[in-house]
Amino acid sequence: AVSAAAAHADELSDMKAQIEALNARVASMETAPSVPAGYQLLAVSKGEALQVPGMMGSDRDRVTNERATIISVMLTADAPAGTTISWSGYVNAAVVYAGNDDQWKIKGKDADGVQLFTTITISTNSNDDWDVKARGQLRVVATTDTAVGEVGVELKMRGDFAGNGVADVYMKTAWGYWAMTPELTFGGGYAGSLGNIGYGYDGACSCYYTDNADVGFNPGDTSQMRLSYASGPFSMAVAIEDAGIYGGFVGDGSSSNGNQLGVAGEIKYWGDMFSGEISGVYRMVDGNDYTAGTVDLASALTASFDSDVDGLWQVGAGLGFNLGDIASLSLAAAIGSGPFTEVNNYTGEITTSLPVKNDWWGISGLASANLSDAVHAEVGLGYKQRQTDGQSFNVDPDLDGDELKSSGIDYTTWAVLGGIYYTPVDQLTIGLEAEWFTTNYSTSTKATADIEGTDVVAGDKLSLDYEQDNWSVDLVSVWRF
């Protein structure tokens, strides 16, 4: 009996020890962190901004989007960071002085070559335009690691100001993507076209309030779906684009090509000392938008037009050379044909659309040098020529045929810009910028019939030569986070 009691006591002691060990283990589990040592559920840091796969931005975009606040979220204790948010933005303001002077020369001759009137020369000058302009931008990139690969979005929101009044915030970029493999990415949304040449005067300059000349090679931002491939320094992409243009001809509020699509592609190489790209774009047009319509030529004069526009296409290339941290050179060239359009270099919006076909080519370059760790300077030069097809206008609906025939417009632009920028820290830049460009065009129009209600008779010919010089100087400051 004594030995049995001793055995039971030993069993109770062992059981008690096991219960105490279990209690200690449970207590340690309750006090243990939910993630391994050295990790946090939410980490906030400063670093390089996330670059979206397949978004082949310009040199200017790479500089603008260089730094950001990085937010990393860990979903579980045994998994790497599942969601990363890159949050960056800036505000800039500038005192801008701008002006221009232009000269019109108008000549008229009748069918026999006799001068109808003394050559008319009209000169105007506007050199006292002072403004304080400002802009705010917020860029957010969010990525999540999923079972099928990385999925993410990019949102870039802007607001522009020039005096009193609130800004209409607009989306410069709204993009989503799926990295199906480390090399292959499928994306879509609203962004710049792959057909844009992201080098040269327009693609590589800092240009906070310069780059106003028509020497860029941007077909205009648009909604699209894109498939891209990247491996090491080599990348390529192809996209299906919407070819619609909204805003109409001469701002009449109509739209064109609303039921048409386009395609764009790009091949790019990016190395430490050398980079380059070859890009192309083709956008279909709706012939009905260019062969049956009217355009307001003056307050009391409306003409119908009939243009032979088959589609928009452009092929171009860009080259970049880097001399370490000392200097860089960026070159761009392109050739194309299609409807006459002009694009806002800041927003990517097509601001001018005319019902006439034009062919164009151009070349530009930008050189940049680091004068010190905090100071860099740049200078750019650009040239672009446009040649429009001849145009016919039916001014009098009671007469068959076209009473006015235009020879087309020979349109050239020369531009030069420069800037010097002081950046003592990543969050601050102060710069002095300047730009000058000259635009020249010449055209002639001949009457093929007498036009009722005017002094114009068949055979009369009117020629126009126009030259405009434009300049701007600004002191700009940029604050970033």
Where are these regions (language model features)?
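Membrane-embedded beta-strands of outer-membrane beta-barrel proteins
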Residues: L138-V140, A174-G176, M225-L227, G265, ...
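Outer membrane beta-barrel
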Residues: A68-G247, N257-S275, G320-G324
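N-terminal periplasmic/intermembrane-space "pro-region" immediately following the signal or transit peptide
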Residues: V2-N92, Y97-G99, W104
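Transmembrane beta-barrel strands of outer-membrane/channel proteins
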Residues: G89-Y97, V153-G159, G188-G192, V238-D242, ...
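Gram-negative outer-membrane beta-barrel proteins
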Residues: V95-Q103, T146, F161-G163, L194-G198, ...
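Short sequence motifs at beta-strands and strand-loop junctions characteristic
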Residues: D129-K133, V166-D168, G216-P219, N257-N259, ...
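Outer-membrane beta-barrel "beta-signal"
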Residues: Y422, D465-F481
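Detector for outer-membrane/organellar transmembrane beta-barrel domains
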Residues: Q260, G265-L417
